From Swiss-Prot:
Interacts with gK (via N-terminus); this interaction plays a role in the coordinate transport of UL20 and gK to the trans-Golgi network (TGN), and is required for their cell surface expression. Interacts with gB. Plays an essential role in egress of virus particles from the nucleus, cytoplasmic envelopment and virus-induced cell fusion. Forms a functional protein complex with gK and this interaction is absolutely essential for their coordinate intracellular transport, gK glycosylation, expression on host cell surface, and function. Together, they modulate gB-mediated virus-induced cell fusion and virion egress and therefore actively participate in these processes. One of its GO terms (biological process) is viral life cycle. InterPro entries: Herpes_UL20. Keywords: Host cell membrane, Host endosome, Host Golgi apparatus, Host membrane, Host nucleus, Membrane, Transmembrane, Transmembrane helix, Virion. It comes from Psittacid herpesvirus 1 (isolate Amazon parrot/-/97-0001/1997). Its main location: virion. Belongs to the alphaherpesvirinae UL20 family. GO terms for cellular component: host cell endosome membrane; host cell Golgi membrane; host cell nuclear membrane; host cell plasma membrane; membrane; virion component. This is Protein UL20. It comes from the Viruses. Pfam families: Herpes_UL20. It is found in: Virion; Host cell membrane; Host endosome membrane; Host Golgi apparatus membrane.
Length: 248
């Protein structure tokens, strides 16, 4: 007769697997509970109102970091952005040279004196701004600060208003536009008139001299308008798009 206390060989493997199955089931239940809790936390966080802190535009323009890429090591963008201001200054100098030639022919030197002084003042202001831009970029800051930008705007508007006023006065007030529009006016006593009222005969090769003040005035005023627009319009664009004033 077999011993009743001996273990049943058929039931032994089944009894051994029961603790493992229970452990696996408990782990799955706990994992499901954790997953459900995480989902509840995510949904609760999504329902909670969040405080949105708006970034101010001036904070975005405080550093020049990452403004250069690997493909831009030679400063191609800097050359492209400085081409038109340099061209504007070059056009002003050429205009002054043409007026100097016209002065030698007609004797009218008020416009060349005033525009040369205006060009010199603008060149000095541009040179000072260039030094400030160079220093700020080397120190990883934006090119212009608030006071430097205000100085640049004041210089552009001041020189521009003076140049526009001078050209309008000399063309319309002193009849120089009349000289340019009517070729026969060069033989009138108004052109190069002396104190006695006699007419001066224009030297040979100066037949186009009466046209120079009008053409130069148009070109110079166009350059002045560009300078003002190039200084002010970017600030207005940032104000319109970002609703903030930013200096850069």
């Amino acid at each position: 007769m077999a011993d009743a206390s001996a273990p049943d060989k058929k039931n032994a493997p089944t009894n051994a697997l029961k603790p493992d199955l229970i452990k696996i089931a408990v782990e799955r239940v706990l994992a499901a509970i954790d997953t459900e809790n995480n989902e509840d936390l995510i949904l609760a966080a999504a329902r909670e109102p969040r405080e949105v802190v708006a970034a101010r535009a001036p904070d975005l323009f405080t550093s020049a970091a990452y403004s250069w890429s690997e493909e831009d090591e030679l400063g191609t963008r800097m050359r492209a952005s400085s081409f038109f201001p340099v061209a504007s200054m070059f056009a002003k100098i050429i205009c002054c040279l043409f007026l100097l030639w016209a002065k030698s022919c007609t004797g009218h030197g008020a416009m060349v004196t005033g525009l040369t002084a205006c060009t010199g003042a603008y060149a000095i202001a541009s040179l000072l701004c260039s030094f400030v831009v160079y220093y700020n970029v080397r120190t990883d800051n934006m090119p212009f600060g608030t006071y430097t930008k205000l100085f640049q705007i004041a210089a552009c508007i001041g020189c521009g208003c003076y140049a526009l006023g001078l050209t309008m006065e000399k063309l319309f007030g002193d009849s120089e536009m009349y000289f340019a529009l009517f070729p026969d006016a060069k033989n009138s006593p108004l052109v190069g008139a002396t104190a006695k009222g006699s007419a001066l005969i224009l030297p040979q090769g100066c037949s186009v001299a009466p046209y120079v003040p009008l053409a130069v005035s148009v070109a110079y005023c166009a350059a002045v308008v560009y300078d003002i627009a190039d200084t002010i319009f970017p600030l207005l664009w940032v104000r319109t798009t970002l609703n903030e004033f930013a200096v850069f």
